[in-house]
Amino acid sequence: MATFKRLLAWISDLRIAIGLLLVIALASALGTAIPQGELRESYLEGYSDKPWLGFVNGSMILRLQLDHVYTSSWFLALLAWLGLALILCSWRRQWPALQAALQWIDYQEPRQLSKLAIAETISSPPKNESIDKLAAHLHQQGWQVQQQPGRLAARRGIIGRAGPMLVHLGLVLLMLGAVWGSLGGNRLEQFLAPGRSLDLLNRDGNSHLKLTLTNFGIERDPAGRPEQFRSQLELLEPGQDTAKLHEVSVNHPLRFHGLTVYQADWSLAAITLQLGRSPQLQLPLRTFPELGEQVWGLVLPTNPDGSEPVLLSLTSEAGPVQVFDATGERLASLRPAGPTAEVKGIPIRIVDVLPASGLLLKRDPGVPLVYIGFLITLVGGGLSMIATRQLWAVGDPENECLHVGGLCNRNLTGFANELPSLLAAAVPQQ
């Protein structure tokens, strides 16, 4: 039993909790520095030639579960340890301290008050009128007063003692919500072109929501840089005849029945062009990372046998569309809805470019718990700032004086400076 108590004391030690917080903060920094949730091959290939920090290669990242830090077994174990430490600290220290603070201490002798952090003796009338006046004045100032014949005890700000326990409770709820969201949540990144739909299935494999992108717009500044992206969405639930219309933009997500849709990215999905007198052709675009970070295009043959291909590349839905041959020489520059240009004897006209909206869909069941925990933590932190002040007074009719003592868990100097004015208002000096 003694060993078990020592173990509990060690787990709930404040230094251990601070160390755990530092380790968790460091682990969170690792999760920020290393891309999370990518394919296994991307870590093996991306960190083989250039190890992270010079020695952490892809295999080590996978072994240490650094590719999914926030759901790794060791990170969840750290959170569980910290949560247990907070619970034990509240149980072994904060709760007994709160219970002790709620109990009245009845000091009856002046010598008991002389041992307190603040002790003072003032002259008073021979009767106990000073005790009555002090009790009435403290009541007016918002103090709780317990008066006995010839003495009194008073306290104020006792609610501040509950602050640390609420902080611990809020942190535990916050961590539980984060773990619940990591293990029980879903995340999906999807590019949708206007007119395309996405069926979201429940655990039984049945559709519970159909999401359709009706329109996607990109707002650009005068220099052509994107400033805002807006997606017009239709949400249709099973059994409903009318879809609900919603708009999603950057920093303005859509929340719908526990599902959150973010405007996360954009892309170019397809290009519509016309070759000579041919019908309009809509061809898919793909990215060319070797040409730049946001470069899309397609390779278009100019002969029936597929020879002499040309590359059509562009960086925005507004164009221009650059045309290059196999040697890298630029042959033409076209604009959507612009004039026709002849490339290797073929008239080419760009009709339009179809942008795609990059949507991030998240279902996080732990979000309400995180919000509640955060709110409780804020309330507890605010209450912890309230100073708990205790005051005792014992009358001494024989010596015509009043002995006063006090304690304060925060800003003791301020309480000591306030005490003379408090006593002067209650027991005016002659």
UniProtKB/Swiss-Prot annotation:
GO terms for biological process: cytochrome complex assembly. May interact with CcsA. The chain crosses the membrane at residues 14-34, 72-92, 162-182. This is Cytochrome c biogenesis protein CcsB. InterPro entries: Cyt_c_bgen_Ccs1/CcsB/ResB, ResB-like_domain. It holds the Pfam family ResB. GO terms for cellular component: plasma membrane-derived thylakoid membrane. Belongs to the Ccs1/CcsB family. It is a multi-pass membrane protein. It is found in: Cellular thylakoid membrane. Its main location: membrane. Keywords: Cytochrome c-type biogenesis, Membrane, Thylakoid, Transmembrane, Transmembrane helix. HAMAP family: CytC_Ccs1. It comes from Prochlorococcus marinus (strain MIT 9313).
